[in-house]
């Protein structure tokens, strides 16, 4: 199915910010920004690591947002994948990705956009 997969590696995030260290805070941020981006949330799951760090996924009708934090390294990986089955959701994906980036304030960003599938595939 045609879609876009946005992948980020974010370096130099502030390791002690609550979004990096607490599952509930990161969950609230992800859910809020997904909704504000126009996505349809169908579920979510976040896990708190000890002593810190979070992994989480927001399931979207359009596909998903996944995020993993390593506060001890100031490092985050994030991916936003959307399918474009009946509607082009690419702008929503970009808006969500950039909103997450703005919230976590990385000093250095590695970014990839992968076009997935295709109607002619």
Residues covered by each model-derived region:
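Polybasic/polar functional segments that serve as interface/processing modules
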Residues: 1-121
